[in-house]
Amino acid sequence: GDMVIHPRLVEDHVEHARRGHFSQGVRIPLDAHATLVQLAPSAGIQGSLAPGLGGLRRGYAFRLPAMSVLLRRAANSIIAIKSCNQGFWRRDLLAVNGFDEEMRGWGSEDKELCARLENAGIRRQTLLFAAIAFHLDHPPASRGSAAANLALWRETVRSGRTRCDAGIDRHRP
């Protein structure tokens, strides 16, 4: 994977889990140098002290769970949807049939899933200052499918659909 998670990430997702909501943790991008430091054998999660963090990225690396509770709705407008650090109730994810496998490659698959959840009445809560994960630097994936995926997301938003046809059900007995 391309993420290094805070040792208490799962605990944070469990602590903040609420029925009728899915959780979005924070993804903090690391630069090339910080990635090398994090991948060193002696490295541990350094949180806000991690090298290569500046400005807002350093601020997001502070773990302050009590503050997270106060900001979980307001932070939705600050933190983008990123499926690399989300928490769902199993029944909610099954109800919308998970990720739409019609989407190919990079782009909008996470936004499309969240749109279906919200269309189904499941609300997003952002865990700012909790559920922290660092994204390791690497060459970007091909954006060749981005426009087609974005069109699928827009159609989900426009139509209000809550389920996809090509999802988890394909893999269940």
Each PLM stretch: what is its role?
Residues 2-54:
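Conserved donor NDP-sugar-binding/catalytic core segment of glycosyltransferases
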Residues 32, 112, 136-138:
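Short Asp/Glu-rich motifs
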Residues 42-79:
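Short, flexible, basic/aromatic active-site loop/helix in glycosyltransferases
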Residues 81, 85-97, 103-123, 128-129:
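A short, conserved alpha-helix in the catalytic core of glycosyltransferases
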